[in-house]
Every structure is written in structure tokens, then in C-alpha cells.
Amino acid sequence: MDDVTDAERPPRRGAILVLEDRDDVRQGMAQLLELHGFLVVDAAAGEQALDHLRADPDGFALLLLDLRMPGPVDGRDVRRSQLKSPDLADIPTVVVTATVPDGITKAQLRADAWIEKPFRFDDLLLVVRQYVTPNT
């Protein structure tokens, strides 16, 4: 039933936060999304992503989240913090990862969608358009 509710939820307006530690992947995703009319904010580390989210919780329409990140705050930590915060919990989150976690972790993260790396840009755009209205 929850999937039906999610499918009926209209796309949101706002920026897409791309959290990805690899510069080439993060920049490629940002450029692709910007070319298709989306506003993008990117972060290379978990702490930076949380700073962006906390600074403007209403400004984000979607979080594209890589789980494996170097440093003290990885993607799982970002998602846990997001779910604990009433201001951030309702921001749709799509996990973009090369390693799909076990069922328990996956259930705990409660992501709206999952995209497995490597992915096709068309597949990414298809998922993003379910949640975000382009700014054009």
C-alpha cells in the first residue's frame, strides 16, 4: 500500500542533493541533471550533505545518496540522521550504490528507491522525475 501512496505523491519542486564521494560520478550526475532542468547541489562527504540539508530543509526535493563514503559520516549515517529529523525525514531519498545492503539494513534505511551502480543515465532520470519537477 505504501508504494501506491508514493506513486500518487506529486513530484516536488526544489534542488536535488547529490551525495557521492567520487568526483567524476558526482560531477557527471550533476551535469546530467542540470542539462535536464534540475537544480543540483552536490556534496562529497556526509558531513557536507547534512550541513546542506540542515541549512535549507525546505529547499530540497530529493536526496541521491551513496552509502559508502570515506570519513566519519557515511551515507547510512546521513540517512539515519535524516530519518530522525522531522524537518528532513520527508525528503524523498534514492540510494545510489554499488553494494546493496542486507535486508535488515535496507529496511532500516527506508529509501524511496534504489539504483544500483553502474547505472544508465536514462534510468537515473526516470527515477528522479518520479520525485522532482524540473525548474525549466
Give the residues covered by each predicted segment.
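Non-catalytic signal-transmission and effector/linker regions of two-component phosphorelay proteins
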Residues: 1-17, 23, 120-136
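Two-component/phosphorelay signaling modules centered on CheY-like receiver
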Residues: 23-41
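Hydrophobic/aromatic residues positioned on beta-strands within the core alpha/beta folds
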Residues: 94-96
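His-Asp phosphorelay/catalytic-motif detector in bacterial-type signaling
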Residues: 58-61, 86-92
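Short amphipathic alpha-helix used as the core "switch/output" element in two-component signaling
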Residues: 51, 74-89
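Alpha4 helix (beta4-alpha4-beta5 surface) of REC/receiver domains from two-component response regulators
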Residues: 73-77, 98-116, 122, 126, ...
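Active-site residues of response regulator receiver
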Residues: 66-68
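Acidic, metal-coordinating helix/loop segments flanking the phosphotransfer/catalytic sites
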Residues: 42-62
